[in-house]
């Protein structure tokens, strides 16, 4: 295996890289053994390497890199031992999500941050953005925070045509990739002095995409310190509802009556699920508790709680792909070199960070 004696793996990065692939140490050892031409690699060896009790360099570094499908320099980068500040990571997840899957998502988020930073540094992009923290309390509600942010970002009244474009224009980093779980739609992280990062699950239903993203936006602007998880989740939902469906504008569409047919009609206009529209109608007093529950029962009977009718295209981030395009056009890098900057093999890099204009 090709390696370099000048490179030494960072123990915490070995752990982060492994967890981003969803592997245990035994899984890692098995994959390394498969690639090592008959030489057995034990779980104990992987454990010692991740604990920093032995030096990983040269051919052994190359073996780790081949197994993990990252470049050797990627495994030598420094990062926080915990990957990301877990208390400042927010996500929309189901209660059924296991600890191993959640660790994988957190590790993927941290690795994605490193990859995006490498791409932006090469493109000399900087960290400018228009996000700020907005405090909420008994007087200033999540809905107030959403209204404030809409005004500051110059959004017109009514529905938002493209939420991804709005966030990227404000300086956010958005990446869509397969998070290997159906229990989580999105996760976000905003370290001090850096751009907010939103990682979106490519397997999440398209009609949940925008609400999940707006939910994470709410976390980012309102929750800069750890707090009560249940309360913060409710606040993020309230923020998302007002940000995507401002009360005055959506009331005009809901007051004529709310039934399944009306929800189907309004779904593409507001870019949210029928379920989200029904919740909004209830929160604004258009539907009583009994009417809301009856509507949910009807939706369940028709299978709409699993797959709703009326689909629309998922919004696609473009900023990082455009940076890759500029690296190719202005800095004369080919895609393989750009992938190496991000620490990825070409196929995975192209899938995550490239758009049609960047692969021509």
Short names for language-model regions:
Residues 1-360:
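Active-site hotspot residues in diverse enzymes, especially metal/ion-binding acidic/histidine motifs
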């Amino acid at each position: 295996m090709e390696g370099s004696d000048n490179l030494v793996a960072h123990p915490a990065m070995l752990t982060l890289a492994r967890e981003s692939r969803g592997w245990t140490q035994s899984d890692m050892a098995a994959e390394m053994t498969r690639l090592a031409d008959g030489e057995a690699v034990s779980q104990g060896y992987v454990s010692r390497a991740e604990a920093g009790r032995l030096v990983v360099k040269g051919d052994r570094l190359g073996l780790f890199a081949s197994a993990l499908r990252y470049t050797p320099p990627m495994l030598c980068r420094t990062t926080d031992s915990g990957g990301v500040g877990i208390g400042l990571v927010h996500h929309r997840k189901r209660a059924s999500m296991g600890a191993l899957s959640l660790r994988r998502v957190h590790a993927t988020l941290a690795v994605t941050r490193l990859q995006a930073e490498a791409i932006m540094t090469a493109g000399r992009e900087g960290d400018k953005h228009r996000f700020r923290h907005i405090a909420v309390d008994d007087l200033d509600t999540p809905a107030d925070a959403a209204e404030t942010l809409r005004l500051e970002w110059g959004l017109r009244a009514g529905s938002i045509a493209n939420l991804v474009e709005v966030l990227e224009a404000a300086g956010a980093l958005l990446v869509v990739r397969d998070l290997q779980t159906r229990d989580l739609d999105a996760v976000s992280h905003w370290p001090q002095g850096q751009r907010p990062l939103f990682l979106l699950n490519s397997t999440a239903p398209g009609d949940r995409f925008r609400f999940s993203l707006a939910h994470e936006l709410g976390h980012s602007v309102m929750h800069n310190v750890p707090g009560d998880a249940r309360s913060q989740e409710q606040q993020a939902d309230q923020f998302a509802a007002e940000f995507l469906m401002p009360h005055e504008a959506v009331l005009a569409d809901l007051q004529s009556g709310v039934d399944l047919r009306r929800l189907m009609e309004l779904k593409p206009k507001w870019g949210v699920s029928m379920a989200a529209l029904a919740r909004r109608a209830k929160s604004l007093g258009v539907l009583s508790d009994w009417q809301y529950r009856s509507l949910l029962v009807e939706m369940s009977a028709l299978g709409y709680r699993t797959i709703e009718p009326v689909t629309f295209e998922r919004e696609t981030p473009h900023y990082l792909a455009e940076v890759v395009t500029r690296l190719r056009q202005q800095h004369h890098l080919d895609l393989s070199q750009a992938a190496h900057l991000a620490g990825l093999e070409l196929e995975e890099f192209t899938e995550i960070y490239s758009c049609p204009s960047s692969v021509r």
